[in-house]
Amino acid sequence: MPFTQKEITYLRAQGYGRLATVGAHGEPHNVPVSFEIDEERGTIEITGRDMGRSRKFRNVAKNDRVAFVVDDVPCRDPEVVRAVVIHGTAQALPTGGRERRPHCADEMIRIHPRRIVTWGIEGDLSTGVHARDITAEDGGRR
């Protein structure tokens, strides 16, 4: 499993993140999305109402490199920022979305983490930034 228990708890509490894909001409495309974490697979699952026709879906089908960010600012004074940043590869899948969310299209995007960077979710901000590469032994896809 590539995610720690604290990462899973944080991600489950959020529900929205930003997915960055690579466009047809190499330009970044960054959009807000709803998501779920699949603990069994160790992946992030992204669904949507018109997923199969979306630019993000087409981008992933052509170039599987993605970044995904989930963050929040639970306190402004003093400022507290928490985040999970995932770099990895993604699949544009023709089925599975409707199983997860009946109101969504059947197409979905599945993210396989290769690197995870976090800050602020450990409960102690003095611990700083945590970064690690995900190996096949961790449940990552190579």
From Swiss-Prot:
It catalyses: tetracycline + oxidized coenzyme F420-(gamma-L-Glu)(n) + H(+) = 5a,11a-dehydrotetracycline + reduced coenzyme F420-(gamma-L-Glu)(n); oxytetracycline + oxidized coenzyme F420-(gamma-L-Glu)(n) + H(+) = 5a,11a-dehydrooxytetracycline + reduced coenzyme F420-(gamma-L-Glu)(n). One of its GO terms (molecular function) is coenzyme F420 binding. Disruption phenotype: Cells lacking this gene are unable to produce oxytetracycline. It is an enzyme of class 1 (oxidoreductase). Pathway: Antibiotic biosynthesis; oxytetracycline biosynthesis. SUPFAM superfamilies: FMN-binding split barrel. GO terms for cellular component: cytosol. Keywords: Antibiotic biosynthesis, Oxidoreductase. One of its GO terms (biological process) is antibiotic biosynthetic process. Belongs to the pyridoxamine 5'-phosphate oxidase family. Involved in the biosynthesis of the antibiotics tetracycline and oxytetracycline. Catalyzes the C(5) reduction of 5a,11a-dehydrooxytetracycline to yield oxytetracycline as a major product. Also catalyzes the C(12) reduction of 5a,11a-dehydrotetracycline (12-dehydrotetracycline) to produce tetracycline as a minor product. This is 5a,11a-dehydrotetracycline/5a,11a-dehydrooxytetracycline reductase. The lineage of its organism: Bacteria, Bacillati, Actinomycetota, Actinomycetes, Kitasatosporales.
